[in-house]
Amino acid sequence: MHRLDDITAPIQQELLDFEIHFQNAMHADVPLLDKVTSYIVKRKGKQLRPMFVFLCAKMLGQINPITFDATTLVELLHTATLVHDDVVDDAAERRGFFSVNALWKNKIAVLVGDYMLSRILLLSIEKRNMDLLEIVARAVQEMSEGELLQIEKARHLDITEEVYFEVIRKKTASLIATCCEAGALSVGAQEERSQLRLFGELIGLAFQIKDDI
């Protein structure tokens, strides 16, 4: 049994149920859009971000429909950023398969990413999850700021250690922090939100440092 399997063992059923929620969230009535989103769904990753939401929620309470809403929102955001990142980086592959922009060109890839971001807004409003929308929106802002900060500093070749940590905190750690905070929020654990956000941020920093090394 792999180490990740050990970690996800307490939430295996929830992760399976999440796949259905995510598929429904990605569904589109426009045939071309639905074709692209179906392609993305079938080539899923390790689902680390939903894992953090579920584990934090289960640690503090009972997983419930709001928890599934939270996992769907963060995975929509993560997936949208991957699609947009591939356009920015002109990447031809993602997870061993052709990227969306490689198959359908940049214009469609950008619009698909935009569609997923719009789904975050609509699903949050439909479910009246304004607190979840707030922390996910903050993650969108920080991730965008981190990406632009990195581009700016790379052009001037003046990335200091302080700037490096600010970049990875915004680009990578902010989303993991959001996942952990969302897990706490979904079960009403208001007092633990800030601690779990910090926990997620530290994990995100460590993850990115290891990846960079």
Where are these regions (language model features)?
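Mg2+-dependent prenyl diphosphate-binding active-site environment of isoprenoid biosynthetic enzymes
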Residues: 16, 23-213
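N-terminal amphipathic/basic leader segments beginning at the initiator methionine
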Residues: 1-24
